[in-house]
């Protein structure tokens, strides 16, 4: 169990490091960090947390930085994220929280 926690921490560190590296302009090194994190995830059979999974393109492993490597569009309550490197698109349905309108 302790090993899985260490692997998960390392995966998160690598993805965050990739994001920082991409902001500085070195996309190739950032891709390598993400590929390494993916490999750790597969070998250790550990899921990458959703927050971090959405930080990179699943096709070319480029960190998605809005305005630099990613374009975001909203069309009829659907968020469309497009990687500007490989044109990969991912769509997310935008919905209101159902619990926010409840009365006490």
Swiss-Prot record:
Localization annotation: Cytoplasm
Enzyme class: hydrolase
One example GO MF annotation: ribonuclease P activity
Keywords: Cytoplasm, Endonuclease, Hydrolase, Metal-binding, Nuclease, tRNA processing, Zinc
Family: Belongs to the eukaryotic/archaeal RNase P protein component 4 family.
Functional description taken from the UniProt entry: Part of ribonuclease P, a protein complex that generates mature tRNA molecules by cleaving their 5'-ends.
Designated name of the protein: Ribonuclease P protein component 4
Species: Saccharolobus islandicus (strain L.S.2.15 / Lassen #1) (Sulfolobus islandicus)
Name of the gene this protein is made from: rnp4
């Amino acid at each position: 169990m302790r090993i899985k926690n260490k692997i998960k921490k390392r995966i998160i560190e690598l993805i965050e490091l990739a994001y920082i590296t991409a902001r500085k302009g070195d996309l190739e090194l950032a891709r390598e960090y993400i590929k390494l994190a993916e490999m750790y995830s597969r070998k250790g059979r550990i899921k990458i947390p959703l927050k971090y999974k959405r930080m990179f393109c699943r096709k070319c492993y480029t960190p998605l930085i809005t305005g630099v490597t990613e374009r975001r569009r909203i069309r009829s309550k659907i968020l469309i994220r497009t990687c500007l490197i490989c044109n990969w698109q991912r769509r997310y349905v935008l919905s209101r929280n159902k619990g926010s309108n409840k009365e006490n």
